[in-house]
Amino acid sequence: MPITQIISASDSEAGPKPSISLVPDKPSEPETSPRHHRLSRSLSKFKRWRGRSNSSLSMGSSEQQELQDSPNEARSDDDENGYNNDNADDLAKSKYMMKSIAGLLTTASVYAGMNNAQEMNVLSQVDSEESDSSDSFQENIGRNEVKSKKENLKTKSHPEVPRLDKRKPTLFDFSITREKLSKDNVAKLRQRFCLDEQEPFLNDFPAWLLKDVLVQGHIFITTKHFLFFAYLPKNPRSVKMSGNLNIRTKLIRSTRYWCVLKNHLFSMYTSSTELYFPVLTIDLREVQKIETQKHTLNGSATKTFKLYTDESTFKFNADSEFSAKSWVNALKKEQFAAQNSENNSISLKIPLPNIIEIDDQPIVNKALTLRLRALESSQTYAIDDFMFVFMDGSGSQVKESLGEQLAILQKSGVNTLYYDIPAKKSKSSFGKETPATVEQKNNGEDSKYLNVPTSAVPSSENGKKSRFRFRERSNSWFRRAKPLEDSQVEDVEEIYKDAANDIDSSVHSTIHIHEQEDSQEQTVAWKPSHLKNFAEMWAAKPIHYRNKFIPFQKDDTYLIKETEEVSANERFRYHFKFNKEKSLISTYYTYLNRNVPVYGKIYVSNDTVCFRSLLPGSNTYMVLPLVDVETCYKEKGFRFGYFVLVIVIHGHEELFFEFSTEVARDDIERILLKLLDNIYASSAEGSNISSASLGDVQHNPDSAKLKLFEDKINAEGFEVPLMIDENPHYKTSIKPNKSYKFGLLTIGSRGDVQPYIALGKGLIKEGHQVVIITHSEFRDFVESHGIQFEEIAGNPVELMSLMVENESMNVKMLREASSKFRGWIDALLQTSWEVCNRRKFDILIESPSAMVGIHITEALQIPYFRAFTMPWTRTRAYPHAFIVPDQKRGGNYNYLTHVLFENVFWKGISGQVNKWRVETLGLGKTNLFLLQQNNVPFLYNVSPTIFPPSIDFSEWVRVTGYWFLDDKSTFKPPAELQEFISEARSKGKKLVYIGFGSIVVSNAKEMTEALVEAVMEADVYCILNKGWSERLGDKAAKKTEVDLPRNILNIGNVPHDWLFPQVDAAVHHGGSGTTGASLRAGLPTVIKPFFGDQFFYAGRVEDIGVGIALKKLNAQTLADALKVATTNKIMKDRAGLIKKKISKEDGIKTAISAIYNELEYARSVTLSRVKTPRKKEENVDATKLTPAETTDEGWTMI
């Protein structure tokens, strides 16, 4: 399918202008509304400080859960400690109007876009007359740089780039690195397929067997047989995919859940942080069919897909067609693996004389299909069809090799069917499924079934599920052919079994084929009765089960009867969709205390603690892996006569269970502690903290590349998921034939550039070309890491200087800011376009504060991503980082802050941007609706521990983890610093870091004196990084105005990844990078925010219980905060848990995987923004394209 057709119908239609409202319940009102003039006035009412409360960040519903606040001991009351006393002085108060970079842009853009306050209510986003008139306000101010660059510009003002629909289709060239079969492997294959020693192997080829999924394997051709062998992907306990989906029901139109695909279970949760309480769980072993819903008119894919089981049909809505297809592919692969979970390989053995027809047909470029029709057996004479796909063009070689060997057999006197029997029509793989005979010679049992969903055609139509089975040869289900005179015709064997011991001795598994059963008999139809066994429920005694993990005495009074034990275990597995590996140890009747007590039954198995509510109308389930449990302990009951057990979970709130008898409470505590001891003893690293909120596909670039390849071949009409062979002898990996050219565009400070350098280094390792586009002052920093650099104008230091040198708002400041900002933004727009147009990037990743990328990618028609460190996406979970309220105000307010910021930000730059689009880019004017900013793939380089993905985030919004740039390997600490650290340790003193960056304060000396006094009172050693001063750019900022005592060392800038592990606590301004570095080191963190997103991260650090947010900084408040940070054990332990979680994240790898995942979607979003047709003279002749423009994008499977 051409990429031009992969556009959502809703995206291709024009809609109304963006809207905004000042009423939380109605966040939508046109920008041209009379109320719009109140926006700037409303901004001044939003305080830049947010007070803390014990409630979680709200989404307007109790379903949205965030990381819980730390216990009261860790979050001491502000008044008691005094570090947030409202009456105290704030010596760190900015002398001037300090803002963050994006905040500066917002404020100045309002000034520039609204030159006259009386015209605010009549400004229009796309009115060229007003933008032109405002341009003439000071037309020549700040334009000298742009003018000189225009004169030297050799390229045309309008870009001549090929349209997406004019570019050549993607070329897929698959190949697998071949290794010669060793004697050991040949021997195992002979044993596997029961071959004679005198039967040599002639050839082997990589191939794909087509069923409901495309299974990668190998074809082997011997002198007598055609063999196919493939390892089924193993089923590790890892998340395969996760994200937000809407579930549609008859009663409730649509409900949004966080969905996780793991093993054979597809589970739904209320949020990404509540992963122990599933709302709905679907067992893929019971799923009959998975399909994408099609449009009734044109048959194109929609955002909806369905899962069919024997009892129900589940309907899901994804955020895009790409997301729906990704979910369907992932679910089909897991369904195939789950329904063959007791087997880890597929084998196919076809005697060469049985082959009737070999037909090859090209499909996509080099890809080729090979249909092989063979006689099933001498008993039934049914004809089976097998479809193979070759991605590297080797299919013709397979056909040629088979033809040559068949000719040799014919000459030697063997009767073959290849030429004797003409091809006849049969039910082939391109029609309905034909059940194939499957035989296992080494197993004497018959009537064995194995469920394998089969599909025949590479299309969206799914066939019915057929059963491949071991059956008697006397069975005559198939059409009989005329008997042949050759009585030596062998049978075709299609074997699904455990091949670990046959092929690879390093993989251990047991061959096990389950008995034939009716599908309705396989699922035990239990109907739980809440009124059954009332005696047991009221007695509330423990129930023990025989097991090999916790042995019980034979005379145990709580031991269940052997006759009831099997049915009890089966019911347990049925309720929680477990496999046979789970076995019960004990059960209890209890109350689960969360918001309200819920009565139910708790189940303890060998590695899981589960809970199921028993009250009518209640549907609470809990599945808690024991590896996530830290410990458990007894507590007094909340009610008289009840006894409480507290289960402590890593990085999660404690769970409280109330038991009516002390015996039951003590018994479950004893069993849980013993199981935890066994887990810790079996793991060399102790307990593993699982993170089920992040999918394996997000961490594994190979899985992401496979998804990108699936997206590309789906666009060609070949809609089938791929399963990679996990053969230990043939390593398979995917990488592009073409090296992509990435442009990383950002503006701001060093903290804005550094994450892009880390991402760029990761992309270079993937074999891509990377250019970082930013300010000239970072050239040496970027190039020192081996990354190409391009300079753009628009250095925000000039604008910041203007802001901090004017002590108050006045007419002079507004006029000066307006004039300088207009020249500043013009230079940024022009130079950014020149760089991107000259470099011909394939993909652009931009910080949204740079403002220009979304327009440049529309002109160049390339995929566009955004990446940032703070909340920039519309959500009800978090407020915008620059409009953080003084207290939590709920989901409606949070959403409103994003709408408000977007409109104000766009209002200030729309006039210049639209003029630049028309005159330079050759595009039409635009507005917020046409830009579709909320549809752009977004990467947040923040840990999901600090910034959990919201339930209302779209599928293309990814919280990847921090992009750390480790410099500690090259850093050599000065001797003075090492001696200082050693002295603190030798004296047993706590060591803290204090640094606030280059900020401007009212009285630098007074602030330094307060800091010294606080350190002395807290009795700690301090490594100081002084950067504050009374004027921006002051060269004396690094020098101290007062003499420092012996326990304070002013050392200047030191790499955080080296320094922070050396200290016990950190005090800083709360920037995203610094916050990530301190939490990565497991440090209790004290944050004194000054502007922008620093307030947001101060609140988050306090919310998760690993630090303190200071409203005001003076000697007393800082001293109190230092004492808490260095002595509070609960805060220290919680910071250690956060450290473990962050250490398991790989933000760069996850980001690269997300880029691969969303690349085709990003391309479609860019294309959908192209609304204005180009002029005829701007059309590009495909024959005149540069080599870079005509290069095919290919992927190689190695």
Curated annotation (Swiss-Prot):
* Location of the protein in the cell: Cytoplasm; Membrane
Q: Which UniProt keywords apply?
A: Cytoplasm, Glycosyltransferase, Lipid biosynthesis, Lipid metabolism, Membrane, Phosphoprotein, Repeat, Steroid biosynthesis, Steroid metabolism, Sterol biosynthesis, Sterol metabolism, Transferase
Q: State what changing S801A does.
A: In M7-1: Changes substrate-specificity towards protopanaxadiol to produce ginsenoside Rh2
Which parts of the sequence carry Phosphoserine?
Answer: S76, S693
Among Pfam families, the record links this protein to: EryCIII-like_C, Glyco_transf_28, GRAM, PH
Substituting S849A results in: Displays a reduced affinity for cholesterol
Q: Where is the composition biased (Basic residues)?
A: 35-51
Q: Where is the composition biased (Low complexity)?
A: 52-67
Q: What is its EC number?
A: 2.4.1.-, 2.4.1.173
Kindly list the positions annotated as binding UDP-alpha-D-glucose.
Answer: S749, R750, D752, N1025, N1053, V1054, H1056, H1069, S1072, G1073, T1074, D1093, Q1094
An example of a GO molecular function for this protein is: sterol 3-beta-glucosyltransferase activity
Which GO biological process categories is it annotated with? ascospore-type prospore membrane formation; carbohydrate metabolic process; lipid glycosylation; sterol biosynthetic process; sterol metabolic process
Q: Which InterPro entries match?
A: ATG26_PH_GRAM1 (IPR048066), ATG26_PH_GRAM2 (IPR048065), EryCIII-like_C (IPR010610), Glycosyltransferase_28 (IPR050426), GlycoTrans_28_N (IPR004276), GRAM (IPR004182), PH-like_dom_sf (IPR011993), PH_domain (IPR001849)
Use in biotech reads:
Repurposing the glycosyltransferase activity via mutagenesis enables the production of ginsenoside Rh2, a potential anticancer drug isolated from medicinal plant ginseng, using protopanaxadiol (PPD) as sugar acceptor.
Spell out the family assignment given in the record's similarity comment.
Belongs to the glycosyltransferase 28 family.
Q: Which PANTHER family match?
A: STEROL 3-BETA-GLUCOSYLTRANSFERASE (PTHR48050:SF25)
Q: What else is known?
A: Present with 396 molecules/cell in log phase SD medium.
Tell me the protein's name: Sterol 3-beta-glucosyltransferase
Designated gene of the protein: ATG26
